Amino acid sequence: GDSITSGVGLADMKYNIAQIGYDLRPNFEGYSSQCYTALVGKGLGLDRQHAINLGLPGLMSPDMLDMVQNSAMPKMNQASGAYYVYPEYQEYLRKADIISIQIGSNDALVPCIVGLGEATNWKSEQLAALMVSGALRDFNFQKLGLFLEALNRMTLTFDESRATNRLLFRGMDEICDQAYTNVTASLPQIVAGIRALNPDAKIVLLGYTNPVPLLPAWNRYFSKLNRFAKDLATQEGLIYVDIPRAQTAADGHPTVKGHQYIANQILNALK
């Protein structure tokens, strides 16, 4: 998975600073006791040597495909800053009895937020935080007002306003369409790659939570992805786990309750 799986936002997530980016090896077995990997492992009676967290922050679906096929990314993902090389990655997959896949959110979220930064000349930090906070999850006019107020506080130039409006009302559709193409091309290959390494493992495919249902482009993106993932699971004999109401924090990652919810959904699906 990506940062959702790794436990970004939880207090005791483990990592080291690497020459390029971050080294997540300490988190493979030293992950937060509050993340869903820990909770699922506990529910299945597994210790940390038998419940491994391969969540890698910033990962997009083509990056995961590289990791599954080569245990390495050939180059840094410039949009997300992710770059990982772990020779042991494939070996973990070969030895597993159950493998969960959580990937695809960053394929849209990262380029959308980068696009917003570029459109506003990086005046958009507060708006971006609001967009991914989960505060806009349930639409009402008060929350629409918060969104518009954050827009107004940015004090944009004419060109910045025009670029921002284009992104919000047209550009995000283009980004999400491309992201959907990327995920739907990569995900079946990820499943095939895992099966080539370990044909006997149960594969659990997690669905998606939309942190910003107020944005129509993201609504469509995550709705389409959930339908695709569910259909893929049916076609490939995977265990599909729906997580539509995972609670997210200010950075868009699951809260402690969000991880508990995801873990419960997985454990129920494995019964």
Outline where the language-model segments fall.
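Glycine-rich, phosphate-binding/catalytic loops in enzymes
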Residues: 14-23, 70, 115-121, 221
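Acidic/His-rich segments in extracytoplasmic proteins that coordinate ligands and/or metal ions
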Residues: 53-54, 66-68, 72, 91-96, ...
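First exposed extracellular module after export/assembly in secreted or surface-exposed proteins
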Residues: 49-52, 65-66, 196
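Alpha-helical cap/lid subdomain in secreted, periplasmic
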Residues: 77-271
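Serine-esterase "nucleophile elbow" of acetyl-processing enzymes
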Residues: 1-57, 99
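Charged, often glycine-rich, active-site loop that binds/positions anionic groups
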Residues: 57-85, 253-254
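Short, solvent-exposed loop/turn and secondary-structure capping segments
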Residues: 8-13, 64-66, 110-115
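Flexible, glycine-rich phosphate/dinucleotide-binding loops
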Residues: 6, 60, 212
